[in-house]
Amino acid sequence: MAALDASASFDASAIAKAQDETLAEAERLNLLPAPEKTPFENKYAARKLLQERCEVLQAALPGAGTTTPWVRALLGECEAALGDIGYDVEEPHAADPCYARALAALAPGAEALDDSGDHGDEDASEEARIQAAAADEETAEDIAVASAARVRDAALVGAPKHARGAELGAAALRALNGAAVLWQGREQPRRAFRLLKAAEALERLPSLPGGAGFSADTLREAETKTIYYLAQVCASLGDGAASANYCAQTLERQLVGPAPSFDGVTPLDWAKNCVGLARFFVDQGAVLDAMSCCRAGVAAARLDGVDDDPDEPRGSVVADAHKCWAQAHASRAESFIATRRTVATCTEKDAH
């Protein structure tokens, strides 16, 4: 493992190389099989490595000069990884300050978000709810723009050819998503929602001038996590329609491509989730969304391996999907007939 002598002259290339090596080794340790008697042993080793790296970066700051923003951003990258480890080893009290420091470094403004207000409050007027929702959207956009600018500016003054702009952008998303999961677990869903909306806004920025240059794979992975978490948070906030929409997006992302990924969930489970979501959309009158979910459910149910579950054969899931498909068509037909009747009535009145 490359190390940096704090007393040596500042060497940005050496710092970049050590950052690469440290984070790669920490990731390797995180992915090792967990020992049965000491399940967090490898994660503790990764945490120690990252903590030592933070100490080295802190020691490098006094001599960083014009590259100070870059070194601070590298610190934020390490803190985001430390936050994830703190959460994984069931120490949210340790994860919290790490995420806060990562957000302050990479997504300024996000660390100050709180759980106040609720634009889903039934007692609030419609105008008040609309204004609160608009304020949340504006805040999310502001944080996203500030984050992209922070990452861009840090990369511009970093080590030549080793600025890590894409990695720093990914770390910002990692901190936003991780902090959101943390606060959702602490029963502060509004705070989690605001963090996730900031992540969602940041993920839309790469195509805009000045956006952080994420790789396609990094961006897609982060987007899927954000959408998945938003589905849960919106459900906690009582926004069933938004939760269903994010669920549908999550399912779609898991099912597309030549090699569908279910993240440990069996294809049969995903098929049942799709059909359940389709029923919700039928009840809401969202017929096209219901049909899309039915198609996804059938596709998942027909993947190899689902017949291994004797208690829930794929045939019954496919049948449920077809039944829901029929209900969606019936709902669509009823809507069409009702519209025709309304038009006919209006035409008749106009004729008289």
Which stretches of residues belong to each language-model region?
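N-terminal alpha-helical scaffolding segments that mark the starts
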Residues: 1-56, 73
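Residues that mark the junctions of alpha-helical repeat units in TPR/alpha-solenoid scaffolds
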Residues: 18, 46, 68, 75, ...
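"A position-specific structural signal for the A-helix of alpha-solenoid helical repeats
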Residues: 20, 24, 74-77, 81, ...
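Amphipathic alpha-helical segments of tetratricopeptide repeats
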Residues: 54-62, 103-111, 160, 200-211, ...
